Curated annotation (Swiss-Prot):
Biological role stated in the UniProt entry: Produces ATP from ADP in the presence of a proton gradient across the membrane. The catalytic sites are hosted primarily by the beta subunits.
Assembly mode: F-type ATPases have 2 components, CF(1) - the catalytic core - and CF(0) - the membrane proton channel. CF(1) has five subunits: alpha(3), beta(3), gamma(1), delta(1), epsilon(1). CF(0) has three main subunits: a(1), b(2) and c(9-12). The alpha and beta chains form an alternating ring which encloses part of the gamma chain. CF(1) is attached to CF(0) by a central stalk formed by the gamma and epsilon chains, while a peripheral stalk is formed by the delta and b chains.
EC top class, as a word: translocase
Taxonomic superkingdom: Bacteria
UniProt subcellular location: Cell membrane
Family matches, as Pfam families: ATP-synt_ab (PF00006), ATP-synt_ab_N (PF02874), ATP-synt_VA_C (PF22919)
Its membrane topology: Peripheral membrane protein
UniProt: ATP binding residues: 152-159
Reactions catalysed according to its record: ATP + H2O + 4 H(+)(in) = ADP + phosphate + 5 H(+)(out)
Organism: Oceanobacillus iheyensis (strain DSM 14371 / CIP 107618 / JCM 11309 / KCTC 3954 / HTE831)
UniProt keyword list: ATP synthesis, ATP-binding, Cell membrane, CF(1), Hydrogen ion transport, Ion transport, Membrane, Nucleotide-binding, Translocase, Transport
GO molecular function: ATP binding; ATP hydrolysis activity; proton-transporting ATP synthase activity, rotational mechanism
Name used for this protein in its record: ATP synthase subunit beta
EC number: 7.1.2.2
């Protein structure tokens, strides 16, 4: 393969000149070796003219210098795929980072850059994916083979929610899961690995990490590494795969970090001008085909709780369901802090979820909306000034709001309370009975952090 030399190092961006050799194609992988024998993988981003290319480093450039020899591998970064990846932990390059044995030679590797599936191969069936989380299943149900976004600011519970979904869905689903940790805390990845090992889910899960401490190149490409592994299970084995990504915002953030160094003019709020294109290329590959499905659940950080920020706003367009986490709810101790009025799903349709479910969900939202409108009056004049009808709306809305909370299995070590998994039918039944006024005489606190409606009745007896 052709060889070149490093002419410039600017943090994660490296310029390479190929004197007489053919220039490597954009997205091709290059390898540099330092004097101490360390290897650094680069990915070609731009052709600069003058036989030079500008590349993005996939690991730290410390210890490398100008003049170092660079080898063109003649292909994009390629990562291992197939059953050998299950139960293992990899980095962006598909190198193992767990303590198990190295992978055997000759394992199939696929390039991380691929085209999205053709239109005629896409599947359009709509089937509900039960999560066991009441607020999600009732008001913003997830679609099998769909794309789901968990939106929230810092510290409102995105990662805990995604871990609960892994716990509930991966165990119930029994199929294959891929987890991509993109620019998040290493500690959380470590905790997740051991939790999955303890529960046995790890045997059917491939994990890929490019965490906060890694250079932007790794954080920008690690989502594609995880996606490539998921695509193999979908296309070659016809599996229904779960793809968890935590956090998709860090993918955008990493692109923004290298964008200026690559010489691109910044766009709105300093983001890269190619933001929508990069997001589209990633999201269009996460889809269901006539061979199998990829259901993706993506945590999306919302900077300063501003949903109009270009990064979360660009992601919205690609999703089938959104679960919006609200800081005000977490401050009230309502967990999961999912906003029941802002969260959306295209599956909340009588044709998909059934007439009863749809009517109960709509009535719950109407009751909560009425309560939200009355809150200003309550704050200024107090409850006594409300009509009897409005007082009843407020009482039921508060019970609904508390009943939308529940304990999580993954938070048991913090709360000391066992987690609860609530089937959809039980969820619909519980809210229907609250709306009918069956539990108007029970204290509000009995509805807080419980699973089924029967638990509310038991809790209320203990409070007497």
């Amino acid at each position: 393969m052709s060889k070149g030399r490093v002419t410039q190092l600017m943090g994660p961006v490296v310029d390479v000149r190929f004197e007489d050799a053919e220039l490597p194609a954009v997205n091709n992988a290059l390898v540099v070796r330092s004097d101490s024998g360390e290897e650094l993988t680069l990915e070609v981003a731009l052709h600069l003219g003058d036989n030079s290319v500008r590349t993005i480093a996939m690991s730290s450039t410390d210890g490398f210098k100008r003049g170092a020899e660079v080898e063109n591998l003649g292909r994009p970064i390629s990562v291992p795929v197939g059953d050998v990846t299950l139960g293992r932990v990899f980095n962006v390059l598909g190198e193992k980072i767990d303590l198990d044995e190295p992978l055997e030679e000759g394992v199939r590797r696929d390039p991380i850059h691929r085209e999205a599936p053709d239109f005629e191969n896409l599947s359009t069936e709509t089937e509900i994916l039960e999560t066991g989380i009441k607020v999600v299943d009732l008001l913003a149900p997830y679609i099998k083979g769909g794309k789901i976004g968990l939106f929230g600011g810092a510290g409102v519970g995105k990662t805990v929610l995604i871990q609960e979904l892994i716990n509930n869905i991966a165990q119930e689903h029994g199929g294959i899961s891929v987890f991509a940790g993109v620019g998040e805390r290493t500690r959380e990845g470590n905790d997740l690995y051991y939790e999955m090992s303890d529960s046995g889910v790890i045997a059917k899960t491939a994990m890929v990490f490019g965490q906060m401490n890694e250079p932007p190149g790794a954080r920008m490409r690690v989502a594609l590494t995880g996606l490539t592994m998921a695509e193999y299970f979908r296309d070659e084995q016809g599996q229904d795969v779960l793809l968890f990504v935590d956090n998709i915002f860090r993918f955008t953030q990493a692109g923004s970090e290298v964008s200026a160094l690559l010489g691109r003019m910044p766009s709105a709020v300093g983001y890269q001008p190619t933001l929508a294109t990069e997001m589209g290329q990633l999201q269009e590959r996460i889809t269901s085909t006539d061979k199998g499905s990829v259901t993706s659940i993506q945590a999306i950080y919302v900077p300063a709780d501003d949903y109009t920020d270009p990064a979360p706003a660009t992601t919205f367009a690609h999703l089938d369901a959104t679960t919006n986490l609200d800081r005000k709810l977490s401050e009230q101790g309502i967990y999961p802090a999912v906003d029941p009025l802002e969260s959306t799903s295209r599956a909340l349709d009588p044709e998909v979820v059934g007439k009863e479910h749809y009517e109960v969900a709509t009535e719950v939202q109407q009751t909560l909306q009425k309560y939200r409108e009355l809150q200003d009056i309550i704050a200024i004049l107090g409850m006594d000034e409300l009509s009897d009808e409005d007082k009843l709306v407020v009482a039921r809305a508060r019970r609904i709001q508390f009943f939308l909370s529940q304990n999580f299995h993954v938070a048991e070590q913090f709360t000391g309370q066992p987690g609860s998994y609530v089937p959809v039918q039980e969820t619909v039944k519980g809210f229907k009975e609250i709306l009918e006024g069956k539990y108007d005489d029970l204290p509000e606190d009995a509805f807080r952090l419980v699973g089924r409606i029967e638990e509310v009745v038991e809790k209320a007896k203990g409070m007497e």
